[in-house]
Amino acid sequence: MTNTQVTLVQLDNYGPWTVTPSPRREVDLQTLQSRLYADLSQAIGTRDGYVFFTRFDNMIAVTNGLDLEAHARVQESIRNRYPITASLSIGTGSTPADALVGATGALQQQGSAQDADRRETLLGQPIPDAERTDDDVQIAHFDVIDATGTYTDELDAFASFTHIEAGYAALMRHMHDAHDSLSFFVGGDNIIAVCPGLSDGDYEDAIAHVQDTADVALRVGVGRGASAHDAGMGAKHALEVAREHDTIVERSGRQ
């Protein structure tokens, strides 16, 4: 069984801030969001976590191994470097979806995302070190089979993008609804899913669903570890094995 720790990062009162005292330039907002995501990715990544941009004003991180002090440092860094603040809510559970539901619900109980009085809330309890194991996190790294030959070198850039996004949307919904997993597009033709302990058959079914629904062919590498970094690197190596052997599901060390 997995034991995933998920942190919801929600920018405080961000919508109203973008139009106060008057609407801000879109290019400035996009620049702020991308820089903030990059800084968060670095800050959480140095502690072996993963963060996904999701909607930018609401980001989702896998934070196994990060304690409350580490979360507070992240908040302090945002406050010191940006004209906005962020609330963080930690949830844990046997599935990533359950962990996120808990984190989201706790933050919603503190007030609206656009509540001017709710600032830098820090909620939830991380998994105690004594309860952590080397198998707490399962990461699945999907990519599109021959994306370059099928899309990039054959279609215009936007058509390629829409095909890959259609595959991502189909996978995201299926993995969440069928397996309580959280899947994120991470650029190129890559999708990272944070999963409970799924079988090879579960992944094969997901790949078949995307093929049938979106006509996009996927393969996947799967890894497990004590942190998102450990599991993610295992998944990357497994994906390389799948590419070399022309298979659709491989696991790091055949876990």
Curated annotation (Swiss-Prot):
Q: For this UniProt record, give its keywords in alphabetical order, as a comma-separated list.
A: GTP-binding, Hydrolase, Nucleotide-binding
Q: Tell me one Pfam family matched here.
A: GCH_III
Does the record's keyword annotation contain GTP-binding?
yes
Presence of the UniProt keyword Transmembrane helix in the record: no
Q: What class of enzyme is it?
A: hydrolase
Instruction: Please list the GO terms describing molecular function.
Output: GTP binding; GTP cyclohydrolase IIa activity
The protein's role, per its UniProt record: Catalyzes the formation of 2-amino-5-formylamino-6-ribofuranosylamino-4(3H)-pyrimidinone ribonucleotide monophosphate and inorganic phosphate from GTP. Also has an independent pyrophosphate phosphohydrolase activity.
Descriptive protein name: GTP cyclohydrolase III 1
Species of provenance: Halobacterium salinarum (strain ATCC 700922 / JCM 11081 / NRC-1) (Halobacterium halobium)
Which gene carries the instructions for this protein?
gch31
